[in-house]
Swiss-Prot record:
Free-text disruption phenotype from the record: Dwarf, viviparous, lesion mimic and sterility phenotypes.
Native organism: Oryza sativa subsp. japonica
GO biological processes: cytokinin-activated signaling pathway; phosphorelay signal transduction system
Protein name: Two-component response regulator ORR10
Occurrences of domain Response regulatory (ranges): 10-142
InterPro entries reported for this sequence: ARR-like, CheY-like_superfamily, Sig_transdc_resp-reg_receiver
Length: 201
């Protein structure tokens, strides 16, 4: 009997520095993650199907499912769009906001770290990123999946209740038909004893 093998989690790594990008890619693959790397925030948004100047997706729902990114890890200091700007774009998007985002930076600046965490970042790693940091990623992915599963269940339940409440006429109709049938039967039973009389020989 064949055993189903679970697909590895897919991480999108964003960093304008080639050496840093190669390092994070190697660490992620060593930790059994599927990895896609890009060198800018705008390319990350393009890969995710989002304009870098709009909140609306440019891809269809099936395209989004094919991308299937489970987590985004991005450098903070990048030319053009910073990691913080990318984080804000993701959290402002209705269909990307639940993807966990991890920020990386060489600078240990508390105000920067707090700002990213307040904006919705799940972790803030100081560079150089270590292999031990990779173990912190999976819990965020699993938490996001549980949340997504719960939201899907709530959506299905809401649709089911909506469908049930939109069809009361059919139930009332059948109930009314049944009531009328009982009334006719009762009337017939009252009439029968008076109309059928015994014959005298």
């Amino acid at each position: 009997m064949a055993v189903a093998i679970e697909a590895p989690f897919h991480v999108l790594a964003v960093d304008d520095s080639l050496p840093d990008r190669k390092l994070i890619e190697r660490l992620l693959k060593t930790s059994s993650f599927q990895v896609t790397t890009v060198d800018s925030g705008s390319k990350a948004l393009e890969f995710l199907g989002l304009h870098d100047h709009e909140d609306s997706p440019i891809s269809t729902q099936s395209d989004q499912q094919e991308v299937g990114v489970n987590l985004i890890i991005t450098d903070y200091c990048m030319p053009g769009m910073t990691g913080y700007d990318l984080l804000k774009k993701i959290k402002e998007s209705s269909y990307l906001r639940d993807i966990p985002v991890v920020i990386m930076s060489s600078d240990n600046i508390p105000s920067r770290i707090n700002r990213c965490l307040e904006e919705g970042a799940d972790e803030f790693f100081l560079k150089p990123v270590r292999l031990s940091d990779m173990s912190k990623l999976k819990p965020h992915i699993l938490k996001s999946r549980c949340k997504e599963h719960y939201q899907q269940e709530q959506h299905l339940q809401s649709n089911s209740e909506s469908n049930n409440s939109s069809n009361p006429t059919s139930e009332n109709s059948s109930s009314s038909t049944s009531t009328n049938s009982h009334k006719r039967k009762a009337v017939d039973e009252e009439i029968l004893p008076h109309t059928i009389r015994p014959r005298h020989s």
